[in-house]
Amino acid sequence: MKVLLSALLLLLFAFEPSASGKKLSDPVLSKRMELYHKIEAVTQIPWYALAAVDQYEENVRSNRKDLPEKAGIISIYIPDDIWSGPENPNPKDDAPLSIKVFDGIGMDGDGDGKAEVSNDEDILYTFSQYLLSYGTDEDNIRIGLWNYYRRDQTVGIISEFMKLFKAYGHIDLGEHAFPLPIRTDYSYRSTWGDARGFGGRRIHEGTDIFAHYGLPVKSTCYGVVEMKGWNRFGGWRIGIRDINNTYHYFAHLNGFAKGIKTGQIVEPGQVIGSVGSSGYGPPGTAGKFPPHLHYGMYKDNGRTEWSFDPYPHLRAWERYEYQKKK
């Protein structure tokens, strides 16, 4: 009976439109797009690859205190010793010739005769030339990214951003949606940080939204499905990465929406599964607690990933959807 109810509810909500409409054009995003396309025309490095690296770096800067503030609208960070050269006596060198002599990578991108690490076009052009040394196809770009960052997680995240930007043709993908259909029977409160005992003492890394079996669970963002499957704690669960380096975790599902697979692009409001009570045991275990959606959010800062409280975000998305439907 639960399976039949789940199927009917999924069909009912599968074609619900995205909860958040397209945002008004942001002049900063528009200017970035102009720069990406300008550098692409010169270097043949795809604009969406440059945009993905820049987006990743912007996210990292916003979550790290050891990195300097960006000077312009481009966030790609190239350390002085790499820009000017490791043996360069002038770490702030902006002369292309002497930078080259000392094996720096800094280049003049706007034709003013200077290679300035604070200049948006110089930064983009320099990084594009670095990637160009590996090739213009996506596989070789990923090799170049790995040699630059030396972190598999970073390359994977940037690759997901590339997929998103390439698919949509723009970078304005910051919209969100509440994970359950509003005006249905659900309840939740702030439970992040509460104690949990199953599998050893630990804290609760999310918010539990209690609802009936089979209620559709929706993607909260534009993103890429990084993970789908069983976990002894979370049961049937899905993990989605958005363009803000935030990993959205949906657990204790009753099942997945048809066709959902890892590597797939999803949108805000798209049905990805249904509410259940799976978990706390081997595959198929269910019913050890009331049906609910465990929703978690994790942030990556280029070094590590940590959980943060999703409750304020859920409240904001819920309010926004109610306002949209007034």
Swiss-Prot record:
Give start-end of the signal peptide: 1-19
Q: Which domain of life is it from?
A: Bacteria
Pfam families named in the record: Peptidase_M23
GO aspect biological process, one term:
proteolysis
Q: Which SUPFAM superfamilies match?
A: Duplicated hybrid motif
- Does the record's keyword annotation contain Phosphoprotein? no
Sorted alphabetically, which keywords does the UniProt record give? Cell cycle, Cell wall biogenesis/degradation, Differentiation, Hydrolase, Metal-binding, Metalloprotease, Protease, Signal, Sporulation, Zinc
Induction text: Expressed under the control of the late mother cell-specific sigma factor sigma-K.
Q: Which residues bind Zn(2+)?
A: 204, 208, 292, 294
Q: What class of enzyme is it?
A: hydrolase
Q: Report the co-factor binding details.
A: Binds 1 zinc ion per subunit.
Cofactor(s) the record lists: Zn(2+)
Q: Supply one GO molecular-function term.
A: metal ion binding
Instruction: Write down the EC number.
Output: 3.4.-.-
Miscellaneous section: The presence of single L-alanine residues in the spore cortex increases the spores ability to be resistant to heat.
Question: According to its UniProt record, which protein family does this protein belong to?
Answer: Belongs to the peptidase M23B family.
Quote the function comment for this protein.
Answer: L-Ala--D-Glu endopeptidase involved in production of single L-alanine side chains from tetrapeptides in the spore cortex peptidoglycan. Therefore, is required for the endospore cortex maturation.
From the Swiss-Prot or TrEMBL record, give the protein name. L-Ala--D-Glu endopeptidase
